[in-house]
């Protein structure tokens, strides 16, 4: 017997394995039935593969947005002082989502104001590639996210101060949409399926 919960959306291989197995007299169970009708398990498997499915179908990374908002609709104080909106369990969930992601993106403004690490600390798992998306901001080389792991900076500046600290990719346009699509195509070329975005006020 063979159990598989999720079909590969790639048309080059889709359904071929099942047919080969059944032709060989092997009993095959698929989808929810393969999970013994455990809907929670099936849902977890579907979530695990959703980014891959999207990537195969659209040739773009699957974007997952994380945003902490207060009850009255704010994400930060007016003076940009950092304030905790979420509690420890929410932080663990956020870091678990990070660990599922191939890359995590913030704007250059968020990188400058919050100086985040963008790594995985509260749960076990791999830290994603760090992405900074901005236009003309100059980024200091001593920001936390340059201290370890791979970082890619999409910018209209050469960011020469970051030589040896990050990969710099020059944006081709003054138009946000054009630059955003350029970045997504670039990341798709790197094989990044799941992109987690932690936006600030503007991005």
Predicted regions and their residues:
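Zinc-dependent deaminase
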Residues: 1-203
